Structure formats: structure tokens, C-alpha cells
Amino acid sequence: EVQFDCDWTRTTRNSYFKLCRIARDSLHKKGIELSSTIRLHQLRDDCPPVDRGVLMLYNTGALKSINTKNSILDYLDISPYLKNVSYRMHLDFAYPTFSWGVWFRDNKFKAISRTTDFLDTNYYQQLTDGTYKVLKDHYLESHELLQDDIIRLESPRYDEVLKVKQLAERTLRNN
């Protein structure tokens, strides 16, 4: 199987669908199937010409907003997309199995960090559950963090993943 991952929109749809048709026809001659990732906002549009879709049930929130609690997975972000929806293609579901730190300076998004050691109390102070303040200037992943920068640790909670899974399966089970 070959899988295409494209955040296509209504303006790029025709070009992407043409690519999918050409690739699918070529792959089928070799006995290979083509799948495509499907983002939540794409559920309201036509299905791409592929053998199956994989619905991405992650990266649902506003990553760059300081006010977001968890941009990786939030049931409240997903549920509006799955109300009264049907999709004319079989969908598998992809759930998040990763975490990251979202770094802010002066309430403005700077970068994503994947290797922050929040247990090092010389450099980080926990402010709230999942939010840390930088205590000393230092480098992390080639980025210079400054005192008072904020890092929001995001990780999907198991109970939240299960809740989203139940909603997706209940809503889209016949696909």
C-alpha cells in the first residue's frame, strides 16, 4: 500500500484528485492499493479517488494559541466535525501516540520541542498541570530559551483517546 498525505482544500482539490487517480491506476496495475489521510475538515467534501481513507484524529486544536490546553487531541475540537456526518469511503482511524512541548515567548508561539526535560528544576518550574516556565536562559534543540518563556507540554490522555474513538466509531462505523 502507498499512502498520500495532503492537506488538500477546495482550491487544491482538483489537482490532488487528479494525482490520486493517476497514482491509483498505476499502482493497481502492480497490485498495490492507494490510501489517503483525511483531515476532519475534509469530511464535508468529496472523497479522494483512493481505495480507503485514514481519518486523522489528532492535531485538532490551535497549536499557536497560548490559551489552548492541548492541540494534539481535544474531544471538544473533534465532536463538531463528527455530528451528522457520513463519508462514502471506508475510513480507518489514526489516533495520537506522541507528545511535544509548545514553546512561547511573550505569549507568541516560537516552536515545537520534542526533548524537554521538565524534571530539571534548575531550568523549569511547573506552573500548572502541563505548563512550565523557563527559569534560566539555555539552549534546547538549537533554540535559545530565555527566562520566563513558557512551554506547554501536550500529550493525549488515554481517556480522551477512548472517548474520541467511541465517537468516531459510533458516527462513522458503516463506512
Give short role names for the model-derived ranges.
Residues 1-14:
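Active-site groove signature of glycoside hydrolases
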Residues 18-118:
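Substrate-binding surface in catalytic domains of secreted glycosidases
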Residues 11, 15, 69-73, 156:
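Alpha-helix N-cap and loop-to-helix initiation/capping positions
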Residues 98, 106-175:
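Substrate-binding cleft of secreted/luminal carbohydrate-active enzymes
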Residues 5-7, 51, 148:
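Acidic side chains
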Residues 16, 20, 161-164:
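Aromatic/hydrophobic pocket-lining residues that form the small-molecule binding cavity
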Residues 1, 35, 40, 123-126:
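Short N-terminal helix-initiation segments at or just after the protein's N-terminus
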